[in-house]
C-alpha cells in the first residue's frame, strides 16, 4: 500500500526542521505520492505570499516537494470513486471540503492511505485508511 501526503503534512515539513526526503525514504514498503490537488494548494500558498523573501522560500520548498514525490493525477478511476463518495457523503449529510473529497477518492481508487493532520474531515469517509499527524 502506498501513501498520499496531504498538504497539511507538507506544511508541517515546511515549518519544521523535519526532512521530507528522510520521511519518504524511511517508508521502504510503500511509495509516497503527492496529489495534483495538494500541488495546487502548495503553489497557491506561493502566489499568496506578500513578501518576496517568503515567496522565494515557499517556492523553493514546493519545487523540492515536486521533485521528491511522484504526482498522482486525477484519472477516470479517481473520478468514478469521487462521484460515488460525493453521492454517499451528500446522502448522509456528512460532506467534506471539495479538495479533501478528491484526495479521499484518489486514495480509495488507488488503494492508498492518506497522511494528514485534517482528520476531522477524512474520518467521515468510510474505508479510508488515515495516518494521523498532530
Segments the model singles out, each with a brief description of its role:
Residues 1, 104-134:
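Acidic, PIN/NYN-like endoribonuclease modules and their adjacent C-terminal/linker elements
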Residues 50-53, 89-90, 132-134:
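Short, hinge-like loop/turn segments at secondary-structure boundaries
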Residues 18, 28, 69-70, 126:
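Structural motif
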Residues 44-47, 56, 68-117:
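Active-site neighborhoods of divalent-metal-dependent phosphate/nucleic-acid chemistry enzymes
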Residues 36-37, 75, 134:
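Residues at the C-termini of beta-strands that transition into short coil/loop
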Residues 1-37, 44-63, 120:
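Short, well-structured N-terminal submotif of metal-dependent ribonuclease cores
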